[in-house]
């Protein structure tokens, strides 16, 4: 049968499909037959037949059949893929003679129609179908990938394998591929062995146990693989590096480290990995945890879609999601919209159109993968708006009004910036202000363990002289009490050691000046202080201490021995009267610090803070050793009596140039401190004690010398001596401004109260050109007391020349 005979037979059937050429009309016309019957040549008679309701139903049935065929064959594939071999052979012949047969074919059709049906020839008309029907058909059949179409086609052509089994009665029967179904999870398996192995997962049974350990396994091969661990057998060896492995998979995975192969790719960001576990970890950490955030934002972003921005309203994350997850997110977003029914239908149609567009374009990225991944991490993780983000990830213009509703977590970066600004401010303050004002109050209390009772001391600047004095006089207004608790003394030792550790660990040079008022115990008394105020008793003010600490960074750790400190603490904590009549300043924790023997007035802590005397680095060890010896001898000198000397006075040397022009103290006022003595003691000092001369170099220019100088004229009274000591430094050495203050000189008001008390010899520190000399009053200083003259005659003998030593 030739082509003409087939054509005549089809034309006699009056079928609309029969008008098509069998060899090449099946393809394009059938695709168009779902919608429009595109370029089909029809006569007027056929148009009337097509409008007949019965024939129209037939057309709908044929359209549904064609839709089913397209579902099986796939969208975009022409129907000639399903034509039989005979038709394909005819198609090949007609394709060769395509140019020749086309004109003749149309001529034959017109002639046949003219003679058989007696109808006009060559009248073309397109059958128009409403757009709503076309849209409904498109909604019924969403777009699919070509790869999915090929898979479905192969699945249709391949018939399921039939398994021939022998029943119990001996008859043969066919069995389905997966007839063994699990009772727990309804999973189907091909054999009973696989089913039983799967059931072990639910029951927890592990029948295979290792002989060398207690581990059990579900399968036997797992046990055999585990036994290789005990035997040390590693049959698989790498060819490049020689490493051996128990499993072949491990060896292949190891070889990828040599070759650099990364066969596994992330579905989200298209990043490649060499191992599957790393892909899973990357997907779990970077993407799957963020799907929830994307879904939440999609719910809020979906009402903002408009027909103008449908192509760009999707976030950057949606385009990178797989198709199934993308459909789920779109379904959830559509379900969460609360709008009228009409709006729902319109928006659903627009969503489906955009899904078709995305399915055809496969969500091609609009920007590079690297920048996409970077922006995606920042946006989804911290919700930070990037100014240079690509168009796909930018928010819409309509979303700007919804910023108040959407409140994602934001990244706070103020902590690091504040630290940097804090450091810069600290540096600027240290450059512009004095060392005292450059340290904040928090830093000072950190090193002083919150022993600062007067906060006004930390805010003093050194440039105004009298203003600082007045501020400190106001601050020191409350009376303080004394206690002899030994725990306070031990607490002082602990604080000292902490200061040593804090300064030893730091490598940068800094000077931390701490001035505090320790008002609880006389054990930690560093200096006796007074305020020029007649209303405040001297007994109260003598219990107020000023701790002057100046810490210099030093790599050496030469400090005072613990034995010396312990003896000091034991001595002062066990005193009966609770008042420390003598105070040696052990406040300096480093050798580089000055040995500050401090008896300054309470109204001049600025002097104590600014004063700094440094010892030469080469003489640190010897200086510390001799000073400790001096302290031990002083303790031996005072250990026989509870109270040391009645006229004990420590002088404070101030080298500050800021106080040169104006003295801080009025020399017309004198304050007395009534001492308490036991009359049973013969002498507070041992007569056989040597009087060594300790010359301690504290600064490169000045030195403190302690000598037993007894050349004080007897005609000078204590009052005149005090006035001379106050005014003498300005007369002798105008360049080194030094001021001397005594606080416990006897006054006429208190001399009558102690007529029978034994008064000792008071070693005093006098200043001459920057040196402090230790001397005692002569016998005529206190003519009222005869015992003083007796003790002075014992000690005014000529000193031994060998006992005077100088350390420098």
From Swiss-Prot:
PROSITE patterns: ZINC_FINGER_C2H2_1, ZINC_FINGER_C2H2_2
Main location (coarse class): nucleus
Residue ranges, compositional bias (Basic residues): 150-159
GO cellular component, one term: nucleus
Compartments where located: Nucleus
Swiss-Prot/TrEMBL GO biological process terms: hemopoiesis; regulation of transcription by RNA polymerase II
Keywords: DNA-binding, Metal-binding, Nucleus, Repeat, Repressor, Transcription, Transcription regulation, Zinc, Zinc-finger
Homology family: Belongs to the krueppel C2H2-type zinc-finger protein family.
InterPro entries named among the record's database cross-references: Znf_C2H2_sf, Znf_C2H2_type
Protein name: Zinc finger protein 148
Ranges of compositional bias, category Acidic residues: 56-73
Function: Involved in transcriptional regulation. Represses the transcription of a number of genes. Required for primitive and definitive hematopoiesis during embryonic development.
ZnF C2H2-type: positions: 180-202, 208-230, 236-258, 264-287
């Amino acid at each position: 049968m030739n082509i003409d005979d087939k054509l005549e037979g089809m034309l006699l059937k009056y079928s609309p499909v029969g008008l098509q050429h069998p060899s090449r009309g099946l393809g394009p016309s059938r695709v168009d037959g779902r919608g429009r019957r595109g370029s089909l040549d029809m006569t007027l008679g056929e148009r009337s037949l097509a409008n007949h309701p019965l024939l129209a139903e037939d057309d709908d049935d044929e359209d549904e059949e064609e839709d089913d065929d397209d579902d099986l064959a796939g969208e975009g594939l022409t129907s000639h893929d399903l034509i039989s071999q005979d038709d394909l052979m005819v198609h090949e012949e007609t394709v060769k003679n395509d140019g020749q047969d086309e004109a003749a074919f149309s001529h034959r059709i017109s002639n046949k129609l003219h003679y058989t049906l007696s109808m006009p020839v060559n009248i073309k008309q397109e059958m128009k179908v409403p757009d709503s029907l076309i849209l409904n058909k498109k909604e019924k059949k969403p777009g699919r990938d070509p790869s999915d179409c090929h898979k479905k086609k192969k699945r249709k052509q391949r018939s399921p394998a039939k398994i021939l089994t022998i029943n119990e009665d001996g008859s043969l029967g066919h069995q389905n591929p997966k007839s063994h179904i699990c009772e727990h999870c309804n999973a189907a398996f091909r054999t009973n062995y696989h089913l039983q192995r799967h059931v072990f997962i639910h029951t927890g049974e592990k029948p295979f146990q290792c002989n060398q350990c207690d581990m059990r396994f579900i399968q036997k091969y797992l046990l055999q693989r585990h036994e290789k661990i005990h035997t040390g057998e590693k049959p698989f060896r790498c060819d490049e590096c020689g490493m051996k492995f128990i499993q072949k998979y491990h060896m292949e995975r190891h070889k990828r480290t040599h070759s650099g192969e990364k066969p596994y790719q992330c579905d989200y960001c298209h990043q490649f990995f060499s191992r599957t576990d790393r892909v899973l970890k990357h997907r779990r950490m970077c993407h799957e945890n963020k799907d929830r955030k994307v879904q939440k934002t999609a719910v809020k972003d979906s009402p903002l879609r408009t027909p103008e921005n449908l192509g760009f309203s999707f976030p950057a994350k949606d385009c990178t999601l797989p198709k199934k997850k993308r459909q789920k997110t779109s379904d959830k977003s559509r379900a969460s919209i609360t709008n009228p029914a009409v709006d729902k239908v319109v928006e659903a149609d627009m969503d489906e159109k955009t899904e078709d567009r995305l399915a055809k374009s496969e969500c091609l990225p609009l920007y590079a993968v690297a920048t996409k991944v970077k922006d995606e991490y920042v946006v989804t993780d911290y919700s930070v708006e990037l100014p240079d983000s690509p168009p796909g990830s930018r928010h819409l213009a309509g979303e700007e009004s919804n910023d108040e509703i959407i409140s994602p977590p934001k990244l706070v970066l103020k902590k690091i910036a504040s630290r940097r600004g804090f450091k810069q401010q600290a540096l600027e303050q240290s450059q512009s202000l004095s060392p005292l004002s450059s340290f904040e109050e928090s830093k000072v209390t950190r090193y002083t363990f919150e022993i600062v009772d007067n906060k006004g001391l930390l805010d003093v600047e050194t440039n105004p002289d009298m203003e600082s004095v007045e501020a400190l006089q106001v601050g020191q207004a409350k009376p303080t009490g004394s206690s002899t608790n030994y725990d306070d003394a031990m607490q002082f030792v602990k604080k000292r050691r902490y200061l040593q550790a804090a300064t030893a660990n730091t490598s940068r040079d800094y000077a931390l000046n701490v001035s505090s008022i320790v008002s609880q115990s006389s054990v930690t008394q560093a200096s006796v202080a007074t305020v020029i105020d007649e209303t405040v008793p001297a007994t109260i003010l003598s219990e107020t201490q000023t701790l002057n600490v100046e810490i210099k960074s030093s790599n050496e750790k030469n400090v005072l021995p613990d034995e010396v400190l312990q003896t000091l603490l034991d001595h002062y904590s066990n005193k009966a009267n609770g008042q420390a009549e003598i105070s040696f300043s052990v406040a300096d924790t480093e050798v580089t610090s000055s040995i500050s023997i401090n008896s300054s007035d309470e109204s001049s802590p600025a002097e104590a803070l600014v004063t700094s005397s440094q010892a030469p680095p080469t003489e640190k060890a010897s200086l510390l050793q001799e000073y400790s010896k001096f302290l031990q001898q002083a303790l031996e000198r005072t250990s026989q009596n509870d109270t040391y000397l009645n006229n004990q006075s420590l002088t404070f040397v101030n080298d500050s140039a800021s106080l040169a022009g104006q003295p801080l103290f009025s020399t017309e006022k004198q304050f007395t401190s009534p001492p308490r003595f036991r009359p049973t003691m013969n002498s507070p000092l041992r007569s056989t004690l040597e009087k060594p001369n300790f010359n301690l170099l504290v600064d490169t220019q000045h030195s403190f010398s302690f000598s037993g100088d007894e050349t004080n004229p007897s005609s000078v009274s204590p009052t005149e001596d005090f006035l001379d000591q106050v005014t003498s430094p300005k007369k002798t050495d105008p360049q080194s401004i030094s001021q001397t203050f005594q606080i416990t000189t006897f006054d006429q008001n208190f001399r009558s109260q102690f007529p029978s008390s034994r008064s000792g010899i008071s070693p005093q520190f006098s200043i001459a050109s920057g040196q402090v000399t230790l001397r005692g009053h002569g016998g005529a200083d206190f003519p009222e007391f005869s015992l003083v003259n007796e003790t002075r005659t014992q000690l005014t003998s000529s000193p031994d020349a060998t006992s005077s030593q100088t350390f420098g």
